[in-house]
């Protein structure tokens, strides 16, 4: 089973914020695959189906961003999902709005959700789909920026990135991730 994890914060007040780009991709995949989420005992929302002949699961942790690993690790253990079958989708300050970048592994880059996953999974070697949100201007605090909504100027580019990231995830269901990475990072 492949597990796609979108990082974000639960609650209406965080919907459509920069920090919830991962949730937006997961919601797009659920829409494409016509599946609904259910709350799990693992502190997350989960949906599963068979797509292209492969079992897949979508997860949105409900633990708040900096505790994401507390949802994902128990879920992996319960369903016997290997770290090689996990793809994490999240926002990235170091990419401009609308840009996506796929990686096989890496450090947290200062992202608290990724820090939590690295801690709970015991490795940095899990696949990632990063959605660019850019950096704040005019000395705005990073926390305020990531918890803010996209500007009108950013919105179109970011929505395009959400769709492209969902395309990459769909392709990764049956195509080796390195091949998907080479195609979408080009």
Swiss-Prot record:
Active-site residues from the entry: 19
Record has Cytoplasm as a keyword: yes
Gene3D superfamilies hit by this protein: Peptidyl-tRNA hydrolase
Gene Ontology MF terms: peptidyl-tRNA hydrolase activity; tRNA binding
Known role: Hydrolyzes ribosome-free peptidyl-tRNAs (with 1 or more amino acids incorporated), which drop off the ribosome during protein synthesis, or as a result of ribosome stalling.
Protein name in the entry: Peptidyl-tRNA hydrolase
Recorded name of the encoding gene: pth
EC number of this enzyme: 3.1.1.29
Site keyed Stabilizes the basic form of H active site to accept a proton: positions: 91
GO cellular component: cytoplasm
Any single biological process term in GO: protein quality control for misfolded or incompletely synthesized proteins
Family, similarity comment: Belongs to the PTH family.
Keyword terms of this UniProt record: Cytoplasm, Hydrolase, RNA-binding, tRNA-binding
